[in-house]
Amino acid sequence: MAQEVFVARERETVAEGARWRRRGRDWLVALLLATGLALLIRLLALEAYRIPSASMEQTLQAGDFVLVSKLHYGARLPLSLGLPFSAWYIPGIRLPYFRLPGFTHIQRGDVIVFNYPVETGPVDRKTHYIKRVVGLPGDTLWIHDKIVYVNRIPIAAPEQAQQRWLLQLRTGTELSLDSLEAAGARNISRSAFHAGLFFFDATMAAARTIAQRPEVEMLRPYTTAALLSGEAAQLARQQEDFGPYYIPGRGDTLWLSPRTWPFYRELLTRFENHQVYPLPNGLFMIDGQPGRFCIIQQDYYFVLGDNRDNSLDSRAWGLVPADHVVGKA
């Protein structure tokens, strides 16, 4: 009798151990499935990104998190081999570019997340940037006195776009910094050399409100190129006057000349993988053959930050190739 009780208890112990093993196995499978599903969602559908700078103010603030859709334009498959969503990858291995079908194309005005084109290394390991698309493949873009023209049509800045302004008060009047801040001015500074002269960042709507105050003699966009020299002046001029600049797209025949070569040199040599250099007779040596044109293999986009006077964007470092686009914010 005692032996039968012992055997029964031993069987119960074995059965209990088997149940715990099954539970552990079920939990492990569930954990692996959940992890795999989360990775697939981040890879193919949605991913959160943190805004690293003030270049998109006032639309997006530095430190904000945005959810980026990879479904709109189609998810880009990995271009390097490494641990997903980590900095580790195997150097020297670059996978071919392929994007799954999306349900829309990039439109003017879209805010996109992309890999910073200037950096070297695998495309999908480059730093993430966020900007607004202003120029599309096939567009001719020109910036004059801070106004953006696309195909000769002025493009209004987004309602929350911010820029630098210059304000002159009427003689004998005063305006407090607090009142300017209350009206929407940011980063306010007062001229040390001219009484009643202020500089500040603000949206167009805030600038209109401030301009209506009786103390204001003049309010206009602030331009800096005339006050600077050297590389600083050149960069400022690019912020305020740029182009005209043709934005190439896939299948375009890009004709080269001494005038256009500086615009497209990086695009052709870095992103189109051509070996190109100018010849003394006005021709170009293109992949070992003299000529004047190249066929473009992918689309390109011109992007700007909404905080126009405090943004390093396509005015400074060029176009965004299609294979660098991550998704829509």
Regions of interest found by a model, annotated:
Residues 2-23, 62-329:
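Soluble "head" domains of membrane/secretory-pathway proteins
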Residues 26-44:
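Hydrophobic membrane-insertion alpha-helices, especially the h-region
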Residues 8-10, 41, 49:
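Short, intrinsically disordered low-complexity segments
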Residues 38, 43, 53-55, 135, ...:
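Generic hydrophobic/packing signal
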Residues 45-62:
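Alpha-helical transmembrane signal-anchor/signal-peptide segments
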